[in-house]
């Protein structure tokens, strides 16, 4: 397996505020399943001049998750009707296309720093390898036969609630 990553950051200021652009790409090749993946991603951040405690963000990109050993396992029938386990060399990485919009607000209270972060996200998923659960046993299908999506809102409150200790809620 071979992989590489390249990223650059570009900052510029306008009369409205500070912009930060981040662009990157990850590439990898896995000889086991002969898969080459190319994952571009980009984000933009903005800190407005009217309130330096605010930050707005927008990001998007492709994310791939290579299969683990347990995911490669698939059940097939031999010529006698017996079920046997073998590894699927055609199984590809699961893929997600992410879009995220969010922001932060930092402030001081009681002499300590605090930050509220909120992010809305949408992820389109494909090449999924589903699984079944039987009590504590997880059995993967061993095939890229599903797709899905995830969306939501993450809100975090960070601060020094106990002096000297950073915490997240």
Language-model region placement:
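Surface-exposed extracellular loop regions of Gram-negative outer-membrane beta-barrel proteins
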Residues: 1-32, 37-45, 157-168
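Transmembrane beta-barrel architecture of outer-membrane proteins
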Residues: 1-5, 37-41, 55, 96-100, ...
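Transmembrane beta-strands of outer-membrane beta-barrel pores
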Residues: 2, 25-31, 60-66, 75, ...
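Outer-membrane beta-barrel channels and translocator barrels
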Residues: 12-17, 47-51, 96, 107-111, ...
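Transmembrane beta-barrel strands of outer-membrane/channel proteins
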Residues: 23-27, 44, 58-62, 71, ...
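Outer-membrane beta-barrel translocator domains and adjoining extracellular loop/strand segments
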Residues: 33-39, 69-75, 82-84, 128-136
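Outer-membrane beta-barrel translocator/channel fold
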Residues: 49-99, 105-106
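Membrane-embedded beta-barrel scaffold of Gram-negative outer-membrane proteins
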Residues: 90-151, 166-167
């Amino acid at each position: 397996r071979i992989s590489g990553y390249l990223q650059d950051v570009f900052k510029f200021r306008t009369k409205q505020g500070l912009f930060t652009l981040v662009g990157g790409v990850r590439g990898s090749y896995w000889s086991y399943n002969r898969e080459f993946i190319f994952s571009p991603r980009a984000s933009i951040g903005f800190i407005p001049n009217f309130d330096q405690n605010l930050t707005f963000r927008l990001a998007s990109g492709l994310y791939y998750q290579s299969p683990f050993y347990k995911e490669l396992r698939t059940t097939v029938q031999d010529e006698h009707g017996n079920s046997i386990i073998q590894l699927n060399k055609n199984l590809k990485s699961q893929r997600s296309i992410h879009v995220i919009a969010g922001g932060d607000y930092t402030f001081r209270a009681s002499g300590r720093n605090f930050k509220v972060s909120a992010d809305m996200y949408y992820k389109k998923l494909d090449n999924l390898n589903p699984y079944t659960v039987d009590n504590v046993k997880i059995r993967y299908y061993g095939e890229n036969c599903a797709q899905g999506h995830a969306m939501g809102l993450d809100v975090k409150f960070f601060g020094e609630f106990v002096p000297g200790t950073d915490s997240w809620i």
